[in-house]
């Protein structure tokens, strides 16, 4: 992996497993588009409480040459799947990949 990756945990305990998963997702993005300049990811748990459990929100900022940053905010809304941090990460990076594909076209 050559792209610098900044990972921030907000209201979430640091997890090596989460960092590994994010870095794996970044490698997949690099395989598609090798000109990424940097990636910033914020994993957070909003302070509001839900009846069934806490959900996670993942924000990703991809810095690309010659264009505005690609920003993805995956707010869980009513999606209870985002009670699993790894599902929230997967969904956020899937959205980032789609936006990156649009940028390349």
Please describe what each predicted stretch is:
Residues 1-105:
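N-terminal, polar/charged subdomain of small-to-medium soluble alpha/beta proteins
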């Amino acid at each position: 992996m050559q792209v610098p990756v900044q990972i921030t945990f907000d209201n979430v305990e640091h997890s090596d497993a989460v960092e590994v998963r994010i870095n794996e997702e970044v490698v997949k993005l690099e395989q598609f588009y090798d000109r990424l300049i940097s990636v910033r990811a914020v994993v957070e748990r909003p302070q509001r409480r839900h009846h069934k459990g806490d959900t996670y929100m993942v924000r990703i900022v991809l810095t690309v040459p010659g264009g505005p940053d690609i920003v993805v905010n995956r707010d869980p809304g009513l999606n209870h799947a985002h009670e699993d941090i790894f599902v929230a990460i997967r969904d956020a990076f899937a959205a980032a990949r789609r936006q990156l594909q649009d940028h390349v076209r």
